[in-house]
Amino acid sequence: DIRTENIAVFTDEKWLGFILSQIIQNALKYFDKPKKVLSLYSEENDTSASLVIRDNGCGISASDLPRIFEKGFTGSDRTKNASTGMGLYLAKTLCDRLGLGLAVESREGEFTKVTVIFPKGTVHEMEETSVL
């Protein structure tokens, strides 16, 4: 499910592509329902534009949610899937370097919603340097 809007953002295309790839790969990896739903849509307010990726996968437990951006953290129930704990860590690190926000809302067994936030009035680019 993809809803489109005419919202332009200025950021580093390569790194944004990498961030979105990590988020979408995570969503696809943790689908656990027969009917899989992955939605992408934008939102806008006075201070920012956002890209939202929402799935109906297994969700993230409330106890794991505060740790999902930690390097190497794979969650308490991730033994079924090969995980390194690097995907969301890298996505968050890159968002921070680009001046973007990254927010996650989830309910275990129901959904995960990841929002990439682009503050208005700034250009978000990153020089070629190490992100780790």
Predicted regions, residues:
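Conserved micro-motifs of the catalytic ATP-binding
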Residues: T4, A8-T11
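Short helix-loop "hinge" at the ATP-lid/N-box region of the Bergerat-fold HATPase_c
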Residues: A27-L28
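Short beta-strand/loop element within the Bergerat-fold HATPase_c
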Residues: V37-T47
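Acidic ATP/Mg2+-coordinating residue in the GHKL
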Residues: D55
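Short conserved segment of the HATPase_c
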Residues: I60-G72, S130-V131
